[in-house]
From Swiss-Prot:
GO-annotated cellular components: Ino80 complex; nucleus
Gene this chain is encoded by: NHP10
Protein's organism: Saccharomyces cerevisiae (strain ATCC 204508 / S288c) (Baker's yeast)
Renumbered residue ranges of the record's region Disordered: 78-97, 161-203
Domain of life where this protein originates: Eukaryota
Pfam family, one: HMG_box
Record-listed N-acetylserine modification sites: S2
Protein name per the record: Non-histone protein 10
Amino acid sequence: MSVEEKKRRLEELKDQNVVLGLAIQRSRLSVKRLKLEYGVLLERLESRIELDPELNCEDPLPTLASFKQELLTKPFRKSKTKRHKVKERDPNMPKRPTNAYLLYCEMNKERIRQNGSLDVTRDLAEGWKNLNEQDRKPYYKLYSEDRERYQMEMEIYNKKISNIDADDDKEENEQKIKNNEEGSSTKVADSKGGEDGSLVSSN
């Protein structure tokens, strides 16, 4: 191989490396985007569970088909009430337990994606729907353990909150007593000043 051919081959390899580098970069960005989208989806599902008590149980979430059916059967009504500001969640509050369906999604999403799925959410819902009770048991067990963890952490959290509230009430009461004492002292001083003034005027 001549020097010119080696140079040409080297340039080709450099170009290929640049193309591969760009492809890898695009793939990484795609993975980040998919992770972000999946995270947002999970947050929406968890928010729905928190808002609807019927979903906060061991039963799976409704499928996309049921959502579509619900949208078709129920007319949309615009709420006339003012939207209330959502109370900010205490960052120290324990994380709510993840139900069995979301655990299944979390543990199987990568496998579904690697199989070339075009709609991971739909395929996860279908996969869960096709599981029998025996196959769902491990996810229910994990949910049960996570729920016990949540209950224990909430007990500790509520005790801390109670102690903080008690300390705040104590400080507030002490401040009120202090203010009352200062007010009483001021009144006594004013009354004495009035008496002294009356004595001077009488003399």
